[in-house]
A protein has these predicted regions:
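Conserved AdoMet/S-adenosylmethionine-binding subsite of the radical SAM
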Residues: 1-124
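Radical SAM enzyme core and accessory elements
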Residues: 128-151
């Protein structure tokens, strides 16, 4: 996400930290449509704060069907990742993880990763875990009624 005051505190510490930024879109305008926090901590300022970290940063990028998975998105993400020397973790949106949104099909995720790699960006497609028991990232928050959520 990029909470800038927290990033600055971590960067000032003597320990070395690996920073992962929840990016989810390659431009500020596209990111705002997905992540309202862009209003408070805009992408430019987040990336400026990230420059203080001495270790390689990672961009976390949840693939949302029709929202951030076009060839143009891949090209813009590749340029951004290349500029900042970032690793890109691609994560398919979990079914039911966000109302009204659909995951990018797996073949399109692979093609997106290939497009990044062809442009010199290290991109990794992360495997979803916990889907079989409806406990993947973003799924537990939506649980209501009987089940684990009330415990």
């Amino acid at each position: 996400v990029g909470i800038i005051p927290g990033m600055k505190k971590l960067a000032a510490r003597p320990e070395q930290f690996r920073l992962a930024i929840s990016l989810h879109a390659p431009t500020a305008e596209r990111r705002l449509a997905i992540m309202p926090i862009e209003k408070k901590y805009d992408l430019k300022a987040v990336l400026e704060a990230a420059a203080a970290f001495r270790k390689r940063i990672t961009f976390e990028y949840v693939m949302i069907g029709g929202k951030n998975d076009s060839d143009q998105d891949a090209d813009a993400l590749a340029a951004l990742a290349h500029k900042h020397g970032a690793l890109v973790n691609l994560l398919p949106l979990h079914p039911g993880g966000a109302p009204g949104l659909e995951p990018t099909p797996s073949n399109k995720v692979k093609n997106f990763a290939g497009r990044l790699q062809a442009r010199g960006v290290e991109a990794v497609v992360r495997r979803s875990r916990g889907l079989d028991i409806k406990a993947a990232c973003g799924q537990l928050a939506g649980q209501t009624g009987s089940g684990a959520a009330g415990r």
